[in-house]
Swiss-Prot record:
This protein's GO CC annotations: cytoplasm; ribonuclease H2 complex
Keywords, ordered alphabetically: Cytoplasm, Endonuclease, Hydrolase, Manganese, Metal-binding, Nuclease
Function description: Endonuclease that specifically degrades the RNA of RNA-DNA hybrids.
Keyword Metal-binding annotated: yes
Reactions catalysed: Endonucleolytic cleavage to 5'-phosphomonoester
Stored InterPro entries: RNase_HII, RNase_HII/HIII, RNase_HII/HIII_dom, RNaseH-like_sf, RNaseH_sf
Positions bound to a divalent metal cation: 18-19, 107
Record-annotated RNase H type-2 domain positions: 12-197
Gene3D superfamilies the UniProt entry points to: Ribonuclease H-like superfamily/Ribonuclease H (3.30.420.10)
Name used for this protein in its record: Ribonuclease HII
Single GO MF annotation: manganese ion binding
GN (gene name): rnhB
Length: 238
């Protein structure tokens, strides 16, 4: 008996929950919740599957399972931090399930959601439910990032998906920061200027709350850099 069956035997309806995009510099974090009763062959951690295999499995998952998807935007990530934004996306995924689970299996650790559950480290390799959720979240987010590439063709979002690859970092240095970047993340914050941030706000591309949050982070960062430079040159701070 697998781990999913053990929890189903005890709790009844069990959902697997996972996210995609937590470590990216751009785009949302996407979560999926899956309730699966029928066996699907080949489900594994989405990162270990080819894109073509993920797409094929997604079709079967959508046909055989109840699926909920939740998104937390770059703004929410900047305002609430990535851990809390991930929880927000996961709870939204659970809310969007047509079948309401009594227990959830969550990939990771230390994550408490709106439904009772337990966390499994590397859960996408241990649980078919979490593995299915990882596939749904990954494919859905990849499709979103490909749409961003069409909006911003100077960025290869269809390839690096917003992760901190060498290619992506070079694109930021060459083309500048976008509103869909996570402005609170280094090295995005390092490459962001006060003037560009203000331009985003004045054009209505970011909210006032996000503007003030990032402006404060920029100010704190400049203070740290100033102190380091003065210390390195053996100069008094004031």
């Amino acid at each position: 008996m697998g781990i999913d069956e053990l929890y189903k035997k005890e709790f009844g309806i069990v959902a697997g929950v996972d996210e995609a995009g937590r470590g990216c510099l751009a785009g949302p974090v996407v979560a999926a919740a899956v309730v699966l009763e029928k066996e699907i062959e080949g489900i594994n951690d989405s990162k270990q599957l080819s894109p073509a295999k993920r797409e094929r499995l997604l079709d079967e998952i959508m046909e055989k399972a109840a699926v909920g998807i939740g998104i937390a935007s770059p703004e929410e990530i900047d305002l609430y931090n990535i851990f809390n934004a991930t929880k927000l996306a996961m709870n939204r995924a659970l809310e969007n399930l047509s079948v309401k689970p009594s227990f959830v299996l969550v990939d990771g650790k230390g994550i408490e959601l709106s439904v009772p559950g337990t966390c499994l480290v590397k859960g996408d390799q241990k649980s078919k439910l979490i593995g299915a959720a990882s596939i749904v979240a990954k494919v859905f987010r990849d499709r979103l990032m490909s749409e961003f590439h069409r909006m911003y063709p100077q960025f290869s979002f269809h390839k690096h998906k917003g992760y901190a690859t060498k290619e992506h970092l070079n694109e930021i240095r060459k083309n500048g920061v976008l509103p869909i970047h996570r402005l609170s993340f280094e090295p995005v914050l390092e490459l962001l200027t006060d003037d560009l941030l203000r331009e985003f706000f004045e054009k209505g591309l970011i909210s006032e709350n996000r503007f003030e949050r990032i402006l404060n982070l920029l100010g704190a960062r400049k203070s740290v850099v100033f102190r380091k430079e003065r210390t390195n040159h053996n100069l008094p701070l004031f």
